[in-house]
Amino acid sequence: MKHSEFEIHHRRDDINSYHPSQEKQPIQLHHHDFYEVYYFISGNVDYLVENKTYHLHPGDLLLMSPLELHQPVFREDSGIYERIVLWIDGKKLSELSNSEISFLSCFKQTQSDTEAHLYHIREEKQKTLQYFLDELISTMQTENQYSALIANS
């Protein structure tokens, strides 16, 4: 992570544009030292997390803990692969928690339940979630004295 507490990115790639001589899977199996919230928007993609494969649908949300191996697996005619990824440090995740909700517990559940990595956001809530995530991205890209304060709120 470039920033010590969190980063957020909206990524859009044309997977069909990769040259056939390149490896079939342009993103290799990997892990991070931080938590990852992955919001899937589009593409023909399965997602591998710790030996469990999830077939993704628009509006799916994946939670991955530090050091969990994960990788998108692109299927035939994957097309545009669009997602928003939020990387967040464990300390920051704890700071965002309160007596009513522990964000860390959401990730700890993924380690004990093989289905817990994946959450499907209802269609009527998807636009709202994507709006707030894109607003956070916009705030982070605005370089002024208030952007860090707004992003942390």
Ranges and model annotations:
Residues 1-61, 68, 100-117:
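Generic protein-terminus/edge-of-domain signal
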Residues 2-18, 73-141:
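A hydrophobic/aromatic-rich effector-binding and dimerization subdomain
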Residues 31-34, 123-126, 152:
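Short, solvent-exposed loop/helix junctions and linker helices
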Residues 42, 66, 88-90:
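Residues immediately flanking
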Residues 49, 73, 144-145:
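A generic structural signal for short coil/turn motifs at secondary-structure boundaries
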Residues 57-58, 73, 150:
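Short amphipathic alpha-helical leader/targeting segments
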Residues 66-72:
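Short acidic (Asp/Glu) patches
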Residues 124, 140-153:
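All-alpha amphipathic helical-bundle segments outside canonical DNA-binding/catalytic cores
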